[in-house]
């Protein structure tokens, strides 16, 4: 009494010695049902009672708990009686249930009398197998508090230690889990952690699948407390407060173990082990195939494959995976890690590894001779005295002080002996089933067998079955085979065979191999005594003789792959003579992309290290660079990408000898024996000359640019170089050409690095294969043995499957039927359909319907909604893909062609008579023309079929079936001037009549009545008359981009009309002509016949094509073209082409000229308003164009553009030095002007005498651009004598000075931005910019060059200068003054007197008047104080008063040059 009950400090108390774990778990589970929980004292008393009970003869298996309860003494301490009572209630017995065990009473009460003893009380009843398992469900008393406690690591370790020796799903395994679940009450997450800690990923995946199934059934059935709105059961079970749902989830979690493979038998694919010499990729491929064939549907394959790829690998691969940390990584990482171990570059050797002989010295444990100390049976002596009791005869772990004191047992009802049996542990030999040979036995070592790429480990052995004489045979050594296989021919007489299921690389089979349970003796050449096997596999097809691991283990043979110590050597393939860089251009220098992500940089370094080890690259320090970067593939592996676009741009493209991939249907059925050869890393075997390394160099950067990068260059031909495929094809063709000559009856198909051999006999195929492999190996081309395939069976080549009489694609696309597609999705599915279209029985109209859905979309994320017609096309293509198949060529049968012309395209079929499948389906779109005759399409299709069949099959089609009627074809040949008429006449003897049915059972897939039905538009629309129709009216029509007009005439003009085209659209003359013809045909609709006269060759050709039957293609005028056939339907038409603008007096030319005049608009002269709106010229220019001074002033003042720009009407003026005649002195400057976010340089040159301007638009202000601008100004104005500029660097450069000297031009400089020295050119800059701003304000999209030319036209030739009344161009090109003879006096100029002021003086009084010597634009020459001097107009005033009628002109004369230059 007074014991404290609580949780046990350890998860699972240790079982008493001698009691099985399964029985102990039953006791513990019953104990944990007590409330309150049992204490350590209760477990100690239970262990004490069970130790005593184990010594009684009543202890049986299974235990009779009723009989065991009778052994409990009265007043036994603890709660042992309650635990046994729980077990009694739950035990199922065939007899009547035993009476409950009386509960121990207190000493104060009187116990009831004991029952009378029975003579058979100690004899247990006969055992009957219980109907239910002895496992209890998880049960908690009602109202008990939650016992949930998260796992700790010591708890998980204790549970894993308990289940480590039990099988998955066994009673011991399940009882341990139930006890742990009942004690800790875990949540769903805790159970998932426990499962991942105890089991492999394979078991976790299978358990997860079964648990989801049970949860779905439970949620459907309904559970107490389950709320579907609160989330799934797994989420609700994670809540510690949801005790009821958590217990339901715990029961489902335990029940999910009932269907795992460990409960009955491990699946066949779980026993696939990697052989000692088997490449890792081949082992993974066997696992993949086995899982595909044996895994239940819906089970995720990836985690199972990843788990088995590590656990079932050999020790060498497991060590490599552990070292790289890839024990549970993605499969791609594991394959890449073990790729270096693949025995493709190793020498395969078979050796016998005997046990070492025992030493001659005595064992230091027992002192005897003849064994190693590790095999000694004596226990290892302790190193010294025990640290606890100082006794040297035992270890510390065996010290008696560490053992609890043995309490004296209370007397039981029976006095039994205390001896107990001892259990001896089983000592297993090191190495499993391998038995070491006797020391006296001679050691046999197998001689080294070098294995090349084309050889297999084959030995000559002798096999004896059932004691018969040994028979010699050749056997294959295969470490991947679990059992030895012999052919049935070695078994004498009938024997009893057993069915068995064999799983290999090609899948499961239960017919070819049988199990032979008869002793078998195998005599090996390196072993004296035979290998004896109790059973083996029997090959009923007599193809295989294989020595498996069961025989190799007995002889202690080992296949291993020794490392090749030789360094990497470049394989002896010839160096190419030409690669396209013989002209040695400067190597490209492209900066490396930033790669600061640690993952990408690490992947790039790993890839470079592997390439460096393989000898594909080497350190480099020369010029040239192309960027590199890694790309992650879908399988998780990284791929090295070298961006060689810069190198490809300077490389000369070599002509490829390959015309493209071959059509595999051309393989004749007379070549049934096939074999494929796949080359690995083929490009990396072609050496690259040293002089080309700068073009293929790259840099590996340091992280965060902490240091200079590492430079490398390729030593072999890299991938990504545009001439690499061509060079490799040339090298491979040179290797295979001798084989083609040696075997003329065989065929060698070569495309890139894939090779297919086809021979008429198997013997010839073996010879061809051996010589081809030898030639490839000799030339240094590595061969992938894993991808080599050979008949019998299907051959996979270039994405297709080759069967004996037909060819299919490896995979056909799965088309989801939905109306909403993105542009990318639709493009991808159409690309997949295009790949398999040659074998899909579908018409072109279905494909064209889907292709048309792509029109108008550019954004890859754009959503496309399919129409009902396009959805129907998807259904039709999905049904046709189920019949995707093509036949192989039969050389004895001719080729036939079937052509179906339709408005959506042409469908062609190449087939042979009486064959099950056609050879090819070809879909051809219509040419991109607005109108194409049907006869031309037929001729083009015939040429396409002849080219295809001649290229792929070596012969032409014997005949063609087509859907063009004989009448339509004859009309086309008789009436059409098309060049294709000669082609059709040449092939007329190969045509069948319309609707003739081709032979072959595949025709039921075509719906031939629909396929060969003649299109309605193929028939002619109207009839052409060769002569003029006297009773029909005449129609004349013509059109322009603005108008369309027609005239209908019959002795008189019946009707004429002019139709304007919409002004907001862009039109062409063809559209106007087509619209005019349509309007005229509508007016002539009542007449059944019509004479049409046109001057448009386009319409004449178009109508001729419609008359002979043509296809209406896509065009910009498709809407108008579609309106023509209904208007012409059934009419008789005479067409006549008229030459325009001939001015001939005949009636046809006269009416044609009259029709043309209806659409011609008269040329209206430019008005002053239009001139100012076009050029924004000044008032005097408008007056010269006929406007009055008042109208000109009003136009300038009311112009919105002129008021917006330069509204002040003021420009800076200055005093400058002017020339005395044109091209005397120029002034130049460079001003900047911003146009559409770009700044341009305007080079401005002004003649100081006439004011003529030249402007050049340049992008820079260099000396070269300045010289170019001067030359352009000279071509416009003439060569100057003197130029004046500022002191800019372009004008002061040596190049510009040399230019001026060579052209004899004097150059001087002035102060920039000074009105007294550079005023003229600065003012001209402002005038030009103002005009440009005005033009661009009126028309923002006006090109800058056009605006500059318009400004020059306005300044030089339109604006009138004051007071000369001439334009700058007139002044600049005015004739020179006649020379004045020395003898004669010069003519006196008309007297012109001016008052003047001197510039720069503060005196405001007018002086003079003086008579002017000469006048120019902006100034007059006066003689002041005896010296001539130019005075600007603003400092001059006429001495004579102006006339009254010219007052208005004088008023505006002073400001016109300021307004507009």
Curated annotation (Swiss-Prot):
Domain Integrase catalytic, chain residue ranges per copy: 1218-1387
UniProt keyword annotation of Nucleotidyltransferase present: yes
Reaction catalysis annotation: Endonucleolytic cleavage to 5'-phosphomonoester; DNA(n) + a 2'-deoxyribonucleoside 5'-triphosphate = DNA(n+1) + diphosphate
Zinc finger boundaries on the chain: CCHC-type: 361-378, 384-401
Residue range(s) of DNA binding per entry: 1392-1441
Motif (PTAP/PSAP motif): 94-97, 130-133
Site (Cleavage): residue numbering on this chain: 136-137, 350-351, 446-447, 571-572, 579-580, 1019-1020, 1166-1167
Residues annotated to bind Mg(2+) 2: 1038, 1073, 1095, 1156
One GO term of the biological process aspect: DNA integration
Peptidase A2 domain ranges (all copies): 473-551
Domain RNase H type-1: 1029-1164
Short motif (PPXY motif): ranges: 124-127
Additional note from the record: The reverse transcriptase is an error-prone enzyme that lacks a proof-reading function. High mutations rate is a direct consequence of this characteristic. RT also displays frequent template switching leading to high recombination rate. Recombination mostly occurs between homologous regions of the two copackaged RNA genomes. If these two RNA molecules derive from different viral strains, reverse transcription will give rise to highly recombinated proviral DNAs.
Name listed for the protein in its UniProt record: Gag-Pro-Pol polyprotein
Organism: Human T-cell leukemia virus 2
Gene name linked to the record: gag-pro-pol
């Amino acid at each position: 009494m007074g014991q404290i009950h609580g949780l046990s400090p350890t998860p699972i108390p240790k079982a008493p010695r001698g009691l099985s774990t399964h029985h102990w778990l039953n006791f513990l589970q019953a104990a944990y049902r007590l409330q309150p929980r049992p204490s350590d004292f209760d477990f100690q008393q239970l262990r004490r009672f069970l130790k005593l009970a184990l010594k009684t003869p009543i202890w049986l298996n299974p235990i009779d708990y009723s009989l065991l309860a009778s052994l409990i003494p009265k007043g036994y301490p603890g709660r042992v009686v309650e635990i046994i009572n729980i077990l009694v209630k739950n035990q199922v017995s065939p007899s009547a249930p035993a009476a409950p065990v009386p509960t121990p009473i207190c000493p104060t009460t009187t116990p009831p009398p004991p029952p009378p003893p029975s003579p058979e009380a100690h004899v247990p009843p006969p055992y009957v197998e219980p109907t239910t398992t002895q496992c209890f469900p998880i049960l908690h008393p009602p109202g008990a508090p939650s016992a949930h406690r998260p796992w700790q690591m010591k708890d998980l370790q204790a549970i894993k230690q308990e289940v480590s020796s039990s099988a998955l799903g066994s009673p011991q395994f399940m009882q341990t889990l139930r006890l742990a679940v009942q004690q800790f009450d875990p949540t769903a997450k805790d159970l998932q952690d426990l499962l991942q800690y105890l089991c492999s990923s394979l078991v976790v995946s299978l358990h997860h699948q079964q648990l989801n199934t049970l949860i779905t059934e439970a949620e459907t059935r309904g559970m107490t407390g389950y709320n579907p709105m609160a989330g799934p059961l797994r989420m609700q079970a994670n809540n510690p407060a949801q005790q009821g749902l958590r217990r339901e989830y715990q029961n489902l979690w335990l029940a999910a173990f009932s269907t795992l493979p460990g409960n009955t038998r491990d699946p066949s694919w779980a026993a696939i082990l990697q052989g000692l010499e088997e490449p890792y990729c081949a082992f993974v491929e066997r696992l993949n195939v086995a899982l595909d064939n044996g895994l239940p549907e819906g089970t995720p394959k990836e985690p199972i494959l990843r788990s088995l790829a590590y656990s079932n690998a050999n020790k060498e691969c497991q060590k490599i995976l552990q070292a790289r940390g890839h024990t549970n990584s993605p499969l791609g990482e594991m394959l890449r890690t073990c790729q270096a171990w693949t025995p493709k570059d190793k020498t395969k050797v078979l050796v016998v590894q005997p046990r070492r002989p025992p030493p001659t010295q005595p064992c230091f444990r027992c002192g005897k001779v003849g064994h190693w100390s590790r095999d000694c049976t004596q226990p290892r002596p302790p190193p010294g005295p025990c640290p606890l009791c100082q006794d040297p005869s035992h270890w510390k772990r065996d010290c008696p002080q560490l053992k609890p004191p043995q309490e004296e047992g209370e007397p039981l009802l029976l006095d039994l002996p205390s001896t107990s049996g001892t259990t001896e542990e089983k000592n297993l030999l090191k190495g499993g089933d391998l038995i070491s040979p006797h020391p006296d036995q001679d050691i046999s070592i197998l001689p080294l067998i070098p294995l090349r790429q084309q050889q297999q480990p084959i030995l000559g052995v002798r096999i004896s079955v059932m004691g018969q004489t040994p028979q010699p045979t050749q056997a294959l050594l295969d470490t991947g085979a679990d059992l030895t296989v012999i052919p049935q021919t070695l078994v004498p007489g009938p024997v009893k065979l057993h069915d068995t299921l064999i799983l290999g690389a090609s899948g499961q089979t239960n017919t070819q191999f049988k199990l032979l349970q008869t002793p078998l003796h195998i005599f090996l050449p390196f072993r004296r005594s035979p290998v004896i096997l109790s059973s083996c596999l029997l090959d009923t097809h007599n193809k295989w003789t294989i020595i498996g691991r069961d025989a190799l283990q007995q002889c202690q043979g080992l296949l291993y792959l020794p490392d090749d110590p030789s360094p990497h050597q470049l394989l002896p393939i010839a160096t190419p003579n030409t690669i396209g860089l013989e002209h040695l251009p400067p190597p490209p220098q492209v900066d490396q992309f930033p790669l600061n992500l640690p993952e990408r940089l690490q992947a790039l370094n790993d890839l470079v290290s592997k390439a460096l080890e393989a000898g594909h690259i080497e350190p480099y320090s020369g010029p040239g660079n192309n960027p590199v970067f890694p790309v992650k593939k879908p399988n998780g592996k990284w791929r090295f990408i070298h961006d060689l676009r810069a190198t490809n741009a300077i490389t000369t493209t070599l002509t490829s000898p390959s015309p493209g991939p071959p059509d595999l249907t051309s393989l004749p059925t007379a070549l049934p024996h096939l074999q494929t050869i796949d080359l690995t890393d083929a490009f990396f075997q072609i050496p690259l000359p040293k002089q080309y390394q700068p073009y293929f160099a790259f840099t590996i950067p340091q992280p965060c640019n902490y240091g200079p990068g590492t430079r490398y260059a390729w030593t072999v031909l890299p991938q990504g170089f545009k001439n690499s495929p061509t060079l490799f094809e040339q090298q491979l063709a040179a290797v295979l050409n001798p084989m083609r000559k040696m075997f003329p009856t065989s065929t060698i198909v070569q495309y890139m690095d894939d090779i297919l051999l086809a021979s008429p006999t198997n013997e010839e195929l073996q010879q061809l294969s051996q010589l081809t492999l030898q030639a490839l190996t000799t030339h240094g081309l590595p061969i992938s043995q894993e991808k080599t395939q050979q008949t019998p069976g299907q051959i996979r080549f270039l994405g297709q499957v080759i069967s004996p009489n037909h060819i299919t694609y490896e995979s056909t696309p799965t088309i989801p039927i939905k109306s909403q597609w993105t542009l990318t999705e639709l493009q991808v599915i159409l690309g997949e359909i295009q790949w398999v279209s040659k074998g899909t029985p579908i018409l072109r109209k279905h494909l064209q319907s889907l292709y048309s859905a792509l029109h108008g979309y550019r954004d890859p994320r754009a959503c496309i909604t399919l129409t009902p017609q396009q959805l129907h096309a998807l259904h039709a293509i999905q049904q046709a893909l189920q019949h995707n198949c093509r036949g192989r060529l039969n050389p004895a049968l001719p080729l036939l062609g079937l052509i179906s012309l339709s408005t959506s395209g042409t469908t062609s079929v190449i087939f042979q008579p009486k064959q099950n499948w056609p050879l090819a389906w070809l879909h051809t779109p219509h040419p991109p023309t607005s109108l194409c005759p049907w006869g031309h399409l037929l001729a083009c299709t015939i040429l396409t079929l002849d080219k295809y069949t001649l290229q792929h099959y070596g012969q032409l089609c014997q005949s063609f079936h087509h859907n063009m009627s004989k009448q339509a074809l004859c009309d086309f040949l008789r009436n059409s001037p098309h060049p294709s008429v000669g082609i059709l006449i040449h092939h007329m003897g190969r045509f069948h009549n319309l609707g003739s049915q081709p032979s072959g059972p595949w025709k039921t897939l075509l719906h031939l009545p629909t396929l060969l039905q003649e299109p309605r538009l193929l028939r002619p629309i109207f009839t052409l008359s060769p002569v003029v129709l006297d009773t029909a009216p005449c129609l004349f029509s013509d059109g322009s981009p603005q108008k369309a007009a027609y005239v209908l005439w019959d002795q008189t003009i019946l009707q004429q009309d002019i139709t304007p085209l919409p002004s907001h659209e862009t039109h062409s003359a063809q559209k106007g002509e087509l619209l005019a013809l349509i309007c005229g045909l509508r007016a002539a609709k009542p007449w059944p016949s019509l004479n049409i006269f046109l001057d448009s060759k386009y319409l004449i050709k178009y109508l001729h094509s419609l008359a002979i039957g043509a296809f209406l293609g896509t065009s910009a005028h498709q809407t108008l073209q579609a309106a023509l056939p209904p208007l012409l339907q059934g009419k008789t038409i005479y067409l006549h082409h008229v030459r325009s603008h001939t001015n001939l007096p005949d009636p046809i030319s006269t009416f044609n000229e009259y029709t043309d005049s209806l659409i011609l608009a008269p040329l209206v002269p430019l008005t002053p308003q239009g001139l100012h709106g076009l050029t924004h010229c000044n008032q005097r220019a408008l007056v010269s164009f006929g406007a009055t001074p008042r109208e000109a002033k009003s136009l300038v003042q009311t112009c919105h553009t002129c008021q917006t720009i330069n509204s002040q009407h003021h420009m800076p003026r200055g005093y400058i030095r002017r020339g005395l005649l044109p091209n005397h002195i120029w002034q130049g400057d460079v001003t900047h002007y911003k146009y559409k976010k770009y700044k341009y340089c305007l080079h401005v040159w002004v003649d100081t005498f006439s004011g003529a301007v030249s402007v050049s638009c340049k992008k820079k202000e260099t000396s070269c651009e300045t010289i170019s601008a001067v030359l352009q100004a000279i071509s416009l104005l003439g060569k100057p004598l003197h130029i004046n500029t500022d002191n800019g660097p372009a004008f002061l450069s040596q190049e510009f000075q040399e230019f001026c000297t060579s052209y004899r031009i004097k150059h001087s400089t002035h102060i920039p931005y000074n009105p007294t020295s550079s005023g003229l050119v600065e003012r001209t800059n402002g005038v030009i910019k103002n005009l440009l701003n005005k033009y661009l304000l009126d028309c923002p999209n006006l090109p800058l060059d056009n605006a500059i030319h318009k400004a020059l036209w306005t300044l030089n030739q339109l604006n009138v200068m004051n007071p000369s009344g001439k334009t700058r161009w007139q002044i600049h090109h005015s004739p020179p003054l006649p020379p004045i003879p020395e003898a004669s006096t010069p003519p006196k100029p008309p007297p012109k007197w001016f008052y003047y002021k001197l510039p720069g003086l503060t005196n405001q009084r007018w002086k003079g008047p003086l008579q002017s010597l000469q006048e120019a634009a902006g100034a007059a020459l006066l003689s002041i104080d005896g010296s001539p001097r130019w005075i600007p107009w603003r400092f001059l005033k006429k001495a004579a008063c102006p006339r009254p009628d010219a007052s208005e002109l004088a008023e505006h004369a002073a400001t016109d040059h300021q307004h507009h230059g």
